[in-house]
Amino acid sequence: MARNAYFILLSCLIVLSPSQGQEAEEDLPSARISCPEGSNAYSSYCYYFTEDRLTWADADLFCQNMNSGYLVSVLSQAEGNFVASLIKESGTTDANVWTGLHDPKRNRRWHWSSGSLFLYKSWATGSPNSSNRGYCVSLTSNTGYKKWKDDNCDAQYSFVCKFKG
């Protein structure tokens, strides 16, 4: 008799355990990042677009002072599409928007100001342009803000900051 009761109890535990575990997993809140008002979340980062027009260096400094961020690094096509949508949804008419990509030693070796590896590339046709000698990179409106061109770092453009959420 005790053996039968043990078997029934064990059977019930085996049958109930998977469904109880599934309920527990479904009840867990999903990990979400919290971004300050005016910024938008993508992946584990917050993105802030401003139409304030600054030089590349001043824009990067602005981003560093804002939640320890940097000018935006675009590390994939998906992220580039998100950034382009963010800019377009603002309604801006700006032709160029700064990114964090630059050539600090002026030797045509590009680096993200955030220190991220420069692996993904989305240059506009004809860029980078060796005769232009631009050492900073902007997104261009004529490509829907999806392609990059090298530009004069002293030009004053709007920009996107990226920081951890």
UniProtKB/Swiss-Prot annotation:
Domain C-type lectin positions: 33-163
InterPro entries: C-type_lectin-like (IPR001304), C-type_lectin-like/link_sf (IPR016186), C-type_lectin/snaclec_domain (IPR050111), C-type_lectin_CS (IPR018378), CTDL_fold (IPR016187)
Record field: transmembrane: none
Tissue: Expressed only in regenerating islets and normal exocrine pancreas, but not in normal pancreatic islets. Expressed strongly in pancreas, moderately in gall bladder, and weakly in liver.
Disulfide bonds listed in the record: 35-46, 63-161, 136-153
Cellular location(s): Secreted
Signal peptide (residue range): 1-21
GO molecular function: carbohydrate binding; growth factor activity; identical protein binding; protein phosphatase binding
Modified-residue entries (Pyrrolidone carboxylic acid), positions: 22
A Pfam family per the record: Lectin_C
GO CC terms in record: basal part of cell; collagen-containing extracellular matrix; dendrite membrane; extracellular space; growth cone; neuronal cell body membrane; perinuclear region of cytoplasm; protein-containing complex
The protein's role, per its UniProt record: Might act as an inhibitor of spontaneous calcium carbonate precipitation.
UniProt-recorded name of the protein: Lithostathine-1
